[in-house]
Amino acid sequence: MKKIHILGASFSGKACALKLAQLMPELEIILIDKEVDAQYIPNGVNDQLRGKIIDLAESKMELWNDEEICQRLIVTHAEVLEIRSKEQVLLLRYPNNELKIEPYETLICAMGSIAKSQYIKGSDLDGVLTTKTFKESQKALEMIKEKEDIIIVGAGIIGIDLAYSLSLQGKKVTLLEATDTIQFRQFDKEMMIPLQAEMEAVGIRIVKNVRVKEISQTNSGNLRLISDSGQSYEGERVLLAVNFRPNSHLLESVVERSLDKTVKVNKNLRTSDPHIYAIGDLIALPLSTIHLPYYSPLINQAIKTGQYLAYHLAGIDLPPLQQTKVIGSHSFNLYQSSVGLTEEEGSLYEDLVSHCQKIQSDDNSSALAWLKLIARRKDGRIVGCQIISKDNHLLLINQVSQAISIQLSDSELAFQDFVFLKGESEMAFLLHEVALGLFEKRLLL
C-alpha cells in the first residue's frame, strides 16, 4: 500500500491521517475536504456567545500540533462530486470550478454528519440556521446578532446549549421539542426536573410534544413554524438543533448502508467494497450494553475510529471497537452527563432496576447533585448512569463509562476504591452510595 485517500479532514479523517503518518512514514496520505476550516469544533457558537473566545476561528481542535507529522499530509481543498468505485476514481471539483479525475488505491470515507432537516419543509429558508460547520456558525452569529426573538427546534444537548448561550445575551428563547421531555435520548424524564427549573427561571419557554413540519416567512419578515397538529409559532430567527445524520450520500449505490443511512462496516471498519473504509459519523458502533449498532455522532467516536483504522492499516491488531455513548455538558449552572442507556430505552432490551439519590439544599442554591444508576435485574450489570450537579463531575461519568465497558455489576462498582477527601470528593462517595443502594434494592426484589 503506497497511497491512501481520505475524504474529510475533520476529526475522524485528521485523526486517521496523523496516526497513519506516524505509523507508516513512507505512506502518501491525501486529505480531501471542500472546507478550509474542517477542524472547527461545532460548539464554537456557544463559546463565543458565552465569552470564552473572542473570534470563532479560535474554536478548533488543538490536540494535533506536531508540525513534522502534519507536513507529511497532502491537503487538497476540493469537493468530491462522485465516487466511481468500479474504476476506483474520484470526481473532484476545485474552488475555481475545475473538474478533475483522481484515482485511488485505498479510500477512507470520513465525511462526517449533517445537521439539516430532511423532513421540515422550508428548513432551507435564509433565516433558518444551523451551527455544524464554521461557515454555518459564522452566518448564525451574524444573523442573530440584532434579533431578539429566537426559536430553537430540538431540546437535546445541542438545543439546550444554544438556549443557554442565547439567554446570556438577553434573547427571548422558545424551545420546541417533539417528545414529552428534554434531552430524551440521554436522560430519563425525572432527571431533567432541576435543569428544566433552571431554564424556566431565566425565561426559557419550553414547548413539548411539538413536531415542526413546515417553516414559512411572514409579510413582516419573521418566520412562522407550523407543527403537525396545526400549532403555530413565530420568531425572528430559527435555529435547527435536530439530530445529526450521516453524510453518506456519496456512498449510495457504492457500498451497503443501513436504513438510517449509516455505512455498514466489519470489525476492521471496511465497507462492502474491499478498497473502501468508513469512520467517524458515517458509522454506528456496537453499544456495549446491548451489542447492537448504535449511532452516536460524537467527537470522541470520530477520533477513536480514525486512530483505530490507522492501526489496522499499519498491521497492528486491536480488539473490536465498542462504545458506551458517554456525553457531558454544562449549561444553566448545571453539569449534565449520561452514559449507556436510559431506563426507558433500556427496558426495551432488558428487565432493569434503577436507584437514584439526590443531594439538594433547602434553598436550591448551593448543593445539588442527582445521580441515577441503572442495572440489569438478573445480575446487576451496569447499563446506564445519569448525573446532574452544580459541581463539575464530568470525570466521574468517565469512570462509570469504564465500568460499563468492563461489565461491572452494581456491587463490583460499589466496592471499587475511590478517593475520600472531605469537601473534595463528595461525588465519588455519592456514586459509591448509589451503587450500594442499587445492589441492596436488587436483593429485595
Where are these regions (language model features)?
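A conserved short coil-to-beta-strand element within the FAD-binding core of flavoproteins
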Residues: 76-88, 208-221
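FAD-site-proximal beta/loop scaffold in flavoenzymes
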Residues: 126-147, 232-308
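Core beta-strand elements of the Rossmann-like FAD/NAD(P) dinucleotide-binding domain
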Residues: 97-106, 228-237, 272
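Beta1/beta-strand and adjacent pyrophosphate-binding region of the FAD-binding site
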Residues: 1-10, 148-156
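Beta1-alpha1 glycine-rich phosphate/pyrophosphate-binding loop at the start
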Residues: 2-72, 165-186
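Rossmann-like dinucleotide-binding cores of NAD(P)H-dependent redox enzymes
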Residues: 159-214, 300-301, 318-342
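Mid-to-C-terminal Rossmann-like scaffold of FAD/NAD(P)H-dependent oxidoreductases
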Residues: 9, 285-391, 442-445
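Cysteine/selenocysteine-centered motifs that mediate thiol-based redox chemistry or coordinate metal-sulfur cofactors
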Residues: 407-445
